[in-house]
Amino acid sequence: MDKRIYLCLAHMSGKEQGFIKEAFDTNWVVPLGPNVNAFEDELKHFVGQDKEVVALSAGTAAIHLGLIQLGVGAGDEVICQSFTFCASANPVAYQGAKPVFIDSEEDTWNMDPVLLEEAIKDRIAKTGKKPKAILPVHLYGMPARIDEICAIAAKYEIPVLEDAAEALGSEFKGQKCGTFGTFGVLSFNGNKMITTSGGGALIVPDESAKKQTMFYATQAREPFPHYQHEKIGYNYRMSNICAGIGRGQMTVLDEHIAHHRHVHALYENAFEGVDGITLKSNPDGRFNANYWLSTILIDPVKTGTNYDEVRRKLDERGIETRPLWKPMHLQPVYATNPCYVNGVSERLFNMGLCIPAGPWVTDEDVAYIVEQIKACCKG
């Protein structure tokens, strides 16, 4: 194959330039304006549950502002999912707080509710106080066991900040991911379900929380004619130009989600019954992943190879793949942080690959990818 097949490239609707041109024509090129307002309204309608949405410069910024509004500060602990990208945990450190890492369960690869409750009890026993927040992730678009996580959080009266950066459009029991916690986080990075070039959003419970989020995202400027600041703020608002890209992307969001699910269904059919290669799929009917990235596990005993060897061979054949996230409790920067592990995320990390699933991936591409993966696993 002459072309290179990428994991998930941005796919434009063709309407983005019109919204951007409108911003230039009206000179709305700042971090506010009609595109920002409209993009937030469209996201609010999409996620539902009577939530409000604030468009921001990144998903990381959204996590940071969520933590601030939950009162997370120096000396606090926040329970975080270990099997994730570092941006899920780093904002905890921004606040001078300590991430406490929880391993995954097999069904969804997300935060294990059993370990979560064990960790809460243990942290209370060791520190004399509850963790300040719980930060689960919907990894690769697969919904976590969020009902169990939220039930445990409610039992101990700990708020949930839900990282749905990879899960725009994913659902658990028909409800959109990102709407279960006190706050929810979305990402519009260039490789996500939709993009604003860079960007993210914080899903908040009400208008009051939206105003508070916007306050902190706009350098915490007080309502005076002069510039007055009584709290530390941040430059986290999304520009009107980037929001214009987002508005164009919203017109094809449903198509993008449908395409990712279609590609996954093709993989599911192609890998069925293949010994040594396991495709990650919805555990049962409660889960409806967007399949932002499709993921496979390669059993080294049954295939005679390993994920990294397969990755290198696929790269030579024009197919981009990527190892699964290295768990946070294995990262040098968090080597001394408390962690509650069961071995699941380490095993997954040592066996797994992300494979192409984006809007540019065709049925023919999937057939070629599957053919090459099978060939790599036959030596």
Residue ranges, per PLM feature:
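Structured binding elements
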Residues: 96
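Anion (oxyanion) recognition and catalysis
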Residues: 93, 150, 154, 315
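Conserved coil-to-alpha-helix start sites within the AMP-binding
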Residues: 84-89
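Phosphate-binding glycine-rich loop
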Residues: 32-77, 91-93, 101-103, 126, ...
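Active-site phosphate-binding strand-loop segment of PLP-dependent enzymes
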Residues: 107-196, 201-203, 208
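PLP-dependent aminotransferase class I/II
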Residues: 34-41, 50-51, 114-118, 126-129, ...
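N-terminal "arm"/small-domain region of PLP-dependent enzymes with the aminotransferase-like
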Residues: 1-30, 356
